[in-house]
Curated annotation (Swiss-Prot):
<dbReference type="InterPro" id="IPR022278">
    <property type="entry name" value="Pser_aminoTfrase"/>
</dbReference>
<dbReference type="GO" id="GO:0006564">
    <property type="term" value="P:L-serine biosynthetic process"/>
</dbReference>
<feature type="binding site">
    <location>
        <begin position="237"/>
        <end position="238"/>
    </location>
    <ligand>
        <name>pyridoxal 5'-phosphate</name>
    </ligand>
</feature>
<comment type="pathway">
    <text>Cofactor biosynthesis; pyridoxine 5'-phosphate biosynthesis; pyridoxine 5'-phosphate from D-erythrose 4-phosphate: step 3/5.</text>
</comment>
<comment type="similarity">
    <text>Belongs to the class-V pyridoxal-phosphate-dependent aminotransferase family. SerC subfamily.</text>
</comment>
<feature type="binding site">
    <location>
        <position position="195"/>
    </location>
    <ligand>
        <name>pyridoxal 5'-phosphate</name>
    </ligand>
</feature>
<keyword id="KW-0664">Pyridoxine biosynthesis</keyword>
<keyword id="KW-0663">Pyridoxal phosphate</keyword>
<keyword id="KW-0808">Transferase</keyword>
<dbReference type="InterPro" id="IPR015421">
    <property type="entry name" value="PyrdxlP-dep_Trfase_major"/>
</dbReference>
<comment type="subunit">
    <text>Homodimer.</text>
</comment>
<dbReference type="GO" id="GO:0004648">
    <property type="term" value="F:O-phospho-L-serine:2-oxoglutarate aminotransferase activity"/>
</dbReference>
<feature type="binding site">
    <location>
        <position position="101"/>
    </location>
    <ligand>
        <name>pyridoxal 5'-phosphate</name>
    </ligand>
</feature>
<dbReference type="GO" id="GO:0030170">
    <property type="term" value="F:pyridoxal phosphate binding"/>
</dbReference>
<dbReference type="InterPro" id="IPR020578">
    <property type="entry name" value="Aminotrans_V_PyrdxlP_BS"/>
</dbReference>
<keyword id="KW-0032">Aminotransferase</keyword>
<comment type="function">
    <text>Catalyzes the reversible conversion of 3-phosphohydroxypyruvate to phosphoserine and of 3-hydroxy-2-oxo-4-phosphonooxybutanoate to phosphohydroxythreonine.</text>
</comment>
Length: 360
């Protein structure tokens, strides 16, 4: 029996994609091979690779000025790879810290430069807001400005993306990429791990403006130097072939759903239903300011936290899984990525209401 999976990542996958991958597991398109057995330079995999790149460019509207790269290491590795590729001769990078992940990025950058805290969304209640551009205090000559546009742990999403002129904006989009349209031209670099909205863990997507490819530090490993990866069409070393294949299937699925405009409408409906339920209750609490609430990751707390384990056990009995909040913040968290259907959110909301009534 399939359950409703609210995991923050690796996360729920579209069932159509899972079924297609199962059907093609032993024999991809009459090749007699599984995708995971193919040479990454053979014509069969090359067709998969090129289709994935093309479909992602189409979905996001990536302009010709930007290159799409498939790497490995996830978002965590990019926290080191970004400064190694962008610092050049500069010694400072600016950070807007809106949650746990941008805080990690800030800390990792200390190994390569002197990071400057341009703004913070931290309050007495934790990370609960996305600072407006007017609050950002940029340094005199930063190599770039880093922003995590959706904080998976804290449930903070930044919707207003400013124009920073000549300063490249770097965004960690791991947990909301492909959930809504984006103006890619505003960014110098976008990066994200795949295991939330793109596909399975193993491949990392980097979208980088071409004029930024000449800034790498000499210490940057060649396998992670964007210029080298771009020059080799993401095939400098053996790529995560099966993860790229799965990502390609997800891109095709997104196109069949009507593209990102249609997906955004679904995500608004799902998140609104869940937040409205929380706000109408005196038993559940979300601490994030309404304007910064994530559509993908919804943390919430029970008024009586001694009942947390009962809540999780009851949810599991109804086929509602992986609702436990991150260990650093506690409580609950429902990650409602693209592949989580509206029916799953409705089932969760119904359970939340029942649980509250039983405890009243």
């Amino acid at each position: 029996m399939r359950v409703f999976n609210f995991s923050a990542g690796p996360a729920a996958m579209p069932e159509e994609v899972l079924r297609q991958a199962a059907d093609e597991m032993l024999d991809w398109h009459g090749s007699g091979m599984s995708v995971m057995e193919m040479s990454h330079r053979g014509k069969e995999f090359m067709s998969i690779h090129e289709a994935a790149l093309t479909d992602l460019r189409d979905l996001l509207g990536v302009p010709a000025s930007h290159r799409i790269l498939f790497l490995q290491g996830g978002g965590i590795a990019e926290n080191a790879i970004v400064p190694m590729n962008l610092l050049g001769a500069r010694k400072t990078a600016d950070f807007v810290v809106t949650g746990s992940w941008s805080q990690k990025s800030f800390g990792e950058a200390k190994k390569f430069c002197t990071p400057h805290l341009a703004a913070s969304g931290k309050t007495e209640a934790g990370f609960t807001r996305a600072p407006a551009r007017a609050e950002w205090q940029l340094s005199d000559d930063p190599a770039y400005v880093h922003l995590c546009t959706n904080e998976t742990i804290d449930g903070v999403e930044t919707f207003e993306i400013p124009d920073l002129g000549d300063v490249p904006l770097v965004a960690d989009v791991s947990s909301h990429i492909l959930s809504r349209p984006m103006d890619v031209a505003k960014y110098g670099v976008l990066f994200g791990g795949a295991q939330k909205n793109i596909g399975m863990a193993g491949v990392t997507v980097v979208i980088v403006r071409e004029d930024l490819l000449d800034r790498a530090l000499s210490i940057c490993p060649s396998a992670f130097e964007w210029k080298t990866v771009a020059a080799n069409n993401s095939l400098y070393n053996t790529p995560p072939t099966y993860a790229i294949y799965i990502a390609g299937l997800v891109f095709q699925w997104l196109k069949r759903q009507g593209g990102l405009e249609a997906i955004e409408a679904r995500n608004i409906e799902k998140s609104k239903l869940l937040y409205d339920t929380i706000d109408a209750s005196s038993f559940y609490l979300n601490k994030v300011e309404p304007a910064a609430r994530s559509r993908m990751n919804v943390p919430f707390f029970l008024a009586d936290e001694t009942r947390n384990e009962d809540f999780l056990a009851g949810a599991k009995a109804r086929g509602l899984l992986q609702l436990k909040g991150h260990k650093s913040v506690g409580g609950m968290r429902a990650s409602i990525y693209n592949a989580v259907p509206l029916e799953g959110v409705k089932a969760l909301v119904e359970y939340m209401k029942d649980f509250e009534q039983r405890g009243a």
